Amino acid sequence: MNWDETGPETDEPTGPVLDDRLVDADADGEDTAVEAALRPKDLEEFVGQEKVREQLDLVLKAARARGATADHVLLSGAPGLGKTTLSMIIAAEMNAPIRITSGPAIQHAGDLAAILSSLQEGEVLFLDEIHRMSRPAEEMLYMAMEDFRVDVIVGKGPGATAIPLELPPFTLVGATTRAGLLPPPLRDRFGFTGHMEFYAPAELERVLHRSARLLDVGIDGEGAAEIAGRSRGTPRIANRLLRRVRDYAQVKAEGTIDRSIAMAALKVYEVDARGLDRLDRAVLGALLKLFGGGPVGLSTLAVAVGEERETVEEVAEPFLVREGLLARTPRGRVATPAAWAHLGLVPPQHGAKGQQGLFGA
């Protein structure tokens, strides 16, 4: 199916389409390297998240005025919104070193004890994916956060002895994409909790102009707006698309990104005007063309697009639901009227009638 600038621009995908997604918000190796160069150094330079920035600024300024370590901070939100960047800014604002680790890397209480015992006074410990930490380590963290002390168990069985280990005051910055998985005793020990929201297009345009300047890439307002509109409200995706459009501009044009260059480049990379890629369109295309818009079960839909059900449910569906293109109902997955319009298709009469109860006439 061919499509214009507002809809699909390539043929329908066939077979698995998960590899190398430009619109995946999780960081890859290239992202990690480039983000270090693009990362803001302080709160004033950080774009977006106005409420979190304002509140965090007060917390950090108050801590500096008291000459104390900052309260423990919990940052929640989808991948790619700036949680790691904010943790580094917290350390910079407090003029403190930062130690970075992740929940999956701490599978035993001893792993955590080794990290905590090596911290310097005032150091910031950034714990990414804190919800994936093991339960024994989690329970040790309670005491460390509240009393700056841990009990290290020496020996086994009846002869085991708990030896208290005093810790220097430190600031824990926890990051999670699933705050609901954190037990209340852990959540309650954070002095400040900030939820990271998806970015508005205007905020992403500011991110893109700043990144383009640092990458020495020319970009005009319309070019930035075109990329921002396809970036799913996520700075990491915006910066990734910017790099790919930059490549196209260097090879196919004179290096400056305007609207036409951005559209042509993103057509090559199969990211459409709403930020859908091949996997998203495969799911919607199967739902509309093979199943008349649904309802259809998740497993059946996954087979139709040649992907695992977990891939469809965890990778494609969240964005489609957020965009109002797909609904999860007790009877199965159902396409919305917006999905039909986006792919330029007309819903069958029985599909439209069957969906009235969900979406109106």
Swiss-Prot record:
Mg(2+) binds at T84. Belongs to the RuvB family. The lineage of its organism: Bacteria, Bacillati, Actinomycetota, Actinomycetes, Kitasatosporales. Residues 1-12 have a biased composition (Acidic residues). This is Holliday junction branch migration complex subunit RuvB. PANTHER family: HOLLIDAY JUNCTION BRANCH MIGRATION COMPLEX SUBUNIT RUVB, PTHR42848. Homohexamer. Forms an RuvA(8)-RuvB(12)-Holliday junction (HJ) complex. HJ DNA is sandwiched between 2 RuvA tetramers; dsDNA enters through RuvA and exits via RuvB. An RuvB hexamer assembles on each DNA strand where it exits the tetramer. Each RuvB hexamer is contacted by two RuvA subunits (via domain III) on 2 adjacent RuvB subunits; this complex drives branch migration. In the full resolvosome a probable DNA-RuvA(4)-RuvB(12)-RuvC(2) complex forms which resolves the HJ. Has 3 domains, the large (RuvB-L) and small ATPase (RuvB-S) domains and the C-terminal head (RuvB-H) domain. The head domain binds DNA, while the ATPase domains jointly bind ATP, ADP or are empty depending on the state of the subunit in the translocation cycle. During a single DNA translocation step the structure of each domain remains the same, but their relative positions change. SMART domains: AAA. Its EC number is 3.6.4.-. Residues 1-21 are annotated as: Disordered. It catalyses: ATP + H2O = ADP + phosphate + H(+). It comes from the Bacteria.
